[in-house]
Swiss-Prot record:
GO cellular component terms, semicolon-separated: cytoplasm
Protein name: Probable alpha-L-glutamate ligase 2
Residues that bind Mg(2+) 1: D248, E260
Pfam families: RimK, Rimk_N
Annotated binding of ATP, by residue: K141, E178, Y179, D187, R211, S212, N213
Amino acid sequence: MRIAILSQGPELYSTKRLVEAATLRGHEVKVINPLECYMNINMRQSSIHIGGEELPPFDAVIPRIGASITFYGSAVLRQFEMMGVYALNDSVGISRSRDKLRSMQLMSRRGIGLPITGFANKPSDIPDLIDMVGGAPLVIKLLEGTQGIGVVLAETRKAAESVIEAFMGLKANIMVQEYIKEANGADIRCFVLGDKVVAAMKRQAMPGEFRSNLHRGGTASLVKLTPEERSVAIRAAKTMGLNVAGVDLLRSNHGPLVMEVNSSPGLEGIEGATAKDVAGAIIEFVEKNALKTKKPTQA
């Protein structure tokens, strides 16, 4: 098959591993920077171009679209979809998962466990917002933040009020969540592929830090999931409409709680912690599902 990988970083671990895994299985792979693409949209034959040339036909596209380019990256991916190319994660699922508030609302409607979450627009609502999530300590999150950036633990009510007021003053969209103390600065990343969790790791925050993101200095280790955790992770990914997702769970006194569903989960941490060939599993999934939709293009 001919496979396109939408990525700004051909040198990144995840991109290189996907190229390696696809090549080993006999596929032709091209890494495409979505920001270099431009599109011809018409009723006869839509197309995608780079540098004055039209892209050749592809059988499948694997999106590795960073949060900062969600709008344009999703538009390019949507163009591939319009042209009949199988997308591992489609543009709707990616856009849905990137909206943290919408994600929470959708999962809440499906009865998926979540930290109590509050959202408000007016500073006058701050006291009620804090009470709504159980008071301090609490977590304040920028809706546009990634990799632990824009996440603040407010340990006192006064600190919470000050931080929320500051964010609101900057016209930043935030949400407020209860702090799950019993998680002890750890979360679980479940790597969902289709209807299975193919790998999972526990991420532990550095001493004195509550964010467990590996980009923030957290450490990763192998973890054994409970059947409930496995089920919750798969349901969360399906709620977003994603075939591939990194679902982040907290272990609480009242069961697993979903923190976030990531539509472009990194491979380095999960493969390093589990020694599993996650990239190979992704390519195998693409093979099975792309071939169901159309005849493969000859590489």
